[in-house]
Amino acid sequence: MIAISYSSSANLGPGYDILSMGHDAFYDEVEVLEDHSNGIRISGDGIPLDYKKNTAGLSASMILNDYGIKTGIKINIKKGIPAGLGLGSSGASAAAAVRAINKLFNLGMSHDEMVHYSMHGEIAACGSAHPDNVSSGIYGGITLVQSKNPVKIKKLKINLNFSILLVIPELFMENKTMYARSLVPSKITMDEHIESTQRLSSLISGLITGDRDLVSYGMNDNIVERARIKMFPYYYDLKRRVIENNAISACISGAGPTVLILYDDKSDYNGILRSVDDVMRSYNIKYILKKSRIMEAYND
């Protein structure tokens, strides 16, 4: 049984561990086969082959245990989403594996149940079970984590037309996601909480109602992005320059270093491209650009 899962951008500014946007920039393909040997076998290039250290394998192990499935399985993973760039690579493998296992064994899991198993696979990648990326890998579109325990996910109905431009720097850091999560402050002030809530509610409202100005205002973060800025020193300059060219907004994609830019027909697209190049050259950082669109839904 084969399933695919697309890349995603978590957080979208103020929505740390809450919001995620699935997009069609890249995808992983996962094939799950029954295997008469015991246990879980993993195959694929450039990935952990120990199932306990692999997000797809860890998710699969939980399902087999919880559903009392005695047969072994083989998981073949074709990685299309580059790892370590804030594009939901680890979560995509887990989500695709869960969807494939659900179909293979006809388990009839709900979307939220699939998110539950997928998010626990993330422990293999960063040490914590966070549901944001995997929720868009199961539902598609832009998702909101209503509750983590029990898992409750809401898919937002988007009424704003925009395109996506990903600025993907060639920056790689060992254990980057784990380090990025360690930078998030454990305590914030009431003023910081109020501002963050204002931004998040504005962003969600703007996406649902199609209010461009609300999205532009809302896609700004005063807590997590600020705490992580030393990882991405180019970010504020890049964001300022693309907004000067009437981009809707920009944010760090997940744990970075990729920057997600939203633009529309009011934006100066060529001006955005020039601005990106100017800023990244000034920081002596090589990068690639990837145009994308929202991956709305999966057919399973």
From Swiss-Prot:
Coiled coil: none annotated. GO terms for molecular function: ATP binding; homoserine kinase activity. SUPFAM superfamilies: GHMP Kinase, C-terminal domain (SSF55060), Ribosomal protein S5 domain 2-like (SSF54211). Pathway: Amino-acid biosynthesis; L-threonine biosynthesis; L-threonine from L-aspartate: step 4/5. Keywords: Amino-acid biosynthesis, ATP-binding, Cytoplasm, Kinase, Nucleotide-binding, Threonine biosynthesis, Transferase. GO terms for cellular component: cytoplasm. The keyword Transferase applies. InterPro entries: GHMP_kinase_C_dom, GHMP_kinase_C_sf, GHMP_kinase_N_dom, GHMP_knse_ATP-bd_CS, Homoserine_kinase, Ribosomal_Su5_D2-typ_SF, Ribsml_uS5_D2-typ_fold_subgr. One of its GO terms (biological process) is threonine biosynthetic process. Belongs to the GHMP kinase family. Homoserine kinase subfamily. PANTHER family: HOMOSERINE KINASE (PTHR20861:SF1), HOMOSERINE/4-DIPHOSPHOCYTIDYL-2-C-METHYL-D-ERYTHRITOL KINASE (PTHR20861). This is Homoserine kinase. The lineage of its organism: Archaea, Methanobacteriati, Thermoplasmatota, Thermoplasmata, Thermoplasmatales. The gene is thrB.
